Amino acid sequence: MKAYTERVFGNHEGKDVLAYRFETDGGYQLEVMTYGATILRYVTPDKAGNFANVILGFDDFESYVGNSPKHGASVGPVAGRIAGATFELNGKTYDLEVNNASNCNHSGSTGWDASLFELVEVSDNGLTLYTERTDGTGGFPGNLKIWISYHLEETGAYEVSYKVTTDQDT
């Protein structure tokens, strides 16, 4: 593995948005930014052996803010569509943001993709990012603590792992 690199990719609400790039000796690359724990690049070879980025995304940070397609972003607390933008849990009804016809798609505009994560740890082959969500954010219950880790193997395979704790059912 080569040494990781860090760069400022943008600024969000007065804070630097950092991007971390990891590269194998064989040429595979993975780049992740702290805004939305978003994958910016994954460079891998095609069947002819030519390396190229296969992640759909944007060249500038500003295009990621309010990014409805959520290109490369970590999606949560719910990935997918919640019909009618409402759900019941433990006898209580929760109303969510409507952002797709009458539904809530990918947790709405306040999902993890809109959070600025903090760097917990970084090494030459990966990192762990962290953020918190307060009870009621986006209409969802529970105070959440969220860790997302990315790890690039020398073979080019990468792994994403999530750990979330909460103080109530969600």
Regions found by a protein language model. Give the residues of each.
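Surface-exposed acidic/polar loop and edge beta-strand patches at domain peripheries
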Residues: M1-T170
